[in-house]
């Protein structure tokens, strides 16, 4: 395993998380999102980006962090899964980090029950959890989100 993987590092309550840079489309300041009825609890709502509808995911709920009001300086990390683009709500984005592949430990070797964590990077100040966005939503959550998005699109089109 030679070479580096570029990671976009973001924070939630002083905890560090990352996505592979190749999956990240952009990072933007938080904007108001529209509620999406019948979506899974982890979905805060939807935003419109360049003519597309993107669900906003509350990763606080996935990690069972305390809820908090959205702040004006929060960020949305817009990234692509195999199925769709999603926006992850983060407290801040600290930057891009070139991480040597050999420093990434398989998540299953360190924590169990977190299929949505692909790997862990140990750093001087603790660790960074690398998300696997394709496993972030359960199959049931994916299906609920698909149905909610279809229903929302139908109501916008007057169906």
Predicted regions and their residues:
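An acidic, low-aromatic, low-complexity terminal/linker signal
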Residues: 1-159
């Amino acid at each position: 395993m030679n070479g580096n993987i570029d990671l976009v590092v973001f924070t939630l309550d002083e905890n560090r998380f990352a996505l592979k840079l190749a999956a990240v489309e952009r990072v933007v300041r938080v904007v108001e999102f529209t509620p999406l009825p019948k979506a899974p609890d982890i979905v805060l709502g939807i935003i419109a980006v360049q003519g597309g509808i993107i669900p906003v995911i509350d990763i606080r709920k996935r990690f069972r962090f305390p809820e908090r009001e959205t702040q004006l300086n929060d960020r949305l990390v817009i990234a692509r899964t195999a199925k769709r683009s999603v926006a992850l709500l983060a407290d801040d984005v600290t930057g891009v980090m070139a991480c040597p592949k050999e420093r990434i430990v398989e998540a299953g070797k360190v924590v169990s029950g977190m299929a949505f964590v692909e790997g862990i990077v140990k750093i001087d100040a603790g660790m960074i959890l690398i998300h696997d966005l394709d496993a972030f939503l359960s199959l049931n959550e994916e299906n609920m989100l698909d149905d909610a998005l279809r229903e929302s699109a139908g109501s916008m089109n007057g169906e």
